[in-house]
Amino acid sequence: TENRVLRVVGMPSMAPDFDAISVLGIQWIEPRLESSGNSLKFCVKTRRAAKSFPKTSPEVNFEVGSRIMNKLSPKGLSVNIKEAEYVLEIEIGSSETVVFDNREPGLRGLPVGSSGNVLCLLSGGIDSPVSAFMMACRGCRVHFVFFDNQPFLGRGGYDKVLSLAKKINHFQARGILFVVPFQDIQGAIRDRCNEENRVVLYRRMMYRIAAEIADRQGSLALVTSESLGQVASQTLENLAAVSCVTSVSVFRPLIGMNKESIISRAKEIGTYEVSIVPQPDCCSVFMPKNPVTRSKIPFLERDEEKIPWKELCDDALAKVEIIKVDDL
């Protein structure tokens, strides 16, 4: 109908029907007015996306509001812009006008994909899904890499990460999960390297492999879930010792958050209940009795010389399983 009207010769413009909008507003407000005991404060708020519209927002508010008041003020309706109990909202576009009265708050942030792709190291714990979600809120399309150790841990961790990736993917779509077999690397580190360095050495290998996947897949940064000082591997010295193995940027959204805040966010996004299902993750295998808290890079490099780490990483990369999370 609108297009037909606009194609009529001699028709200079077309405007929203204030009478029709007012009738709709009355239909919505009247039941609320009755349920509130015939006393309700209301206002009209207009937003003009089409700035060419001839009336200003306050003028539209007056046109619609006065019509509604003429009908409902005898029944107890009053205008109160600052303390309105009911708000009728109008958005005027170039081709249509939308009227609504219930604005639900969204997640805000930036549109997914507008900031590029990142690759998140996803475990079965509480923290890493929250990191992934926070990066999605900043406009990143988040892909995932999981370091699997089924020979030592069974399939439980694998299935758990599939569930977590699916939950995070609800906020973005088109995420990809890369599953890396990690058992050979962990076995070599366990058998040949100093026990106290195990966890940091695991992480260095993970970062190297993740960086290579990110480069091949087109992700511009890695995302991890470290929170400074939360566990022994997350001291400044250990984070530096891990980060130095790659030139790819590493984002740590949780670095200044405490555990309570992270848990609260996990509950909000629906990942907490999955994360707390008992299941050891990759880094918990062969945990040292006294893990190093202030590792020295030369000592780590000396440990790595004891194993064919480049060949082990290349072999793991050749066996990566690629899963489209949308298909889960």
Regions found by a protein language model. Give the residues of each.
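The feature marks non-catalytic terminal segments
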Residues: 277-328
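A conserved beta-strand->alpha-helix junction
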Residues: 164-191, 279-281
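Active-site adenylate/phosphate-handling loop in enzymes that bind or generate adenylated species
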Residues: 67-68, 103-115, 182, 186, ...
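A short alpha-helix-loop-beta-strand transition element characteristic
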Residues: 270-278
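RNA-binding accessory domains that recognize and position tRNA/RNA substrates
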Residues: 1-119, 132-176, 244, 292-297, ...
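Generic secondary-structure signature for well-ordered alpha-helical cores
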Residues: 73, 166-174, 212-220, 267-271, ...
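Hydrophobic/small residue at the entry helix of a nucleotide-binding pocket
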Residues: 126-127
